Amino acid sequence: IATVDCSDYPQPVCMGDYMPLCGSDSKTYSNKCNFCNAVVDSNGTLTLNHFGKC
């Protein structure tokens, strides 16, 4: 199972890096920062499906 450490999030500003991750909501997040901010917003209900685009 793929996991991402989001313990340092949320971050107020995400860089523009493009390293896509696919969330359990079937949305593609452009990078770890955007994904982790969404995880925090979801109170931990959002998880990582896999690395790469959905």
UniProtKB/Swiss-Prot annotation:
Limits of the Kazal-like domain: 4-54
Domain of life: Eukaryota
Keyword Glycosyltransferase: no
Stored InterPro entries: Bifunctional_prot_inhibitor, Kazal_dom, Kazal_dom_sf
Glycosylation sites: N43
A GO molecular function held by the record: serine-type endopeptidase inhibitor activity
Name the record gives this protein: Ovomucoid
Organism in which the protein naturally occurs: Podargus strigoides
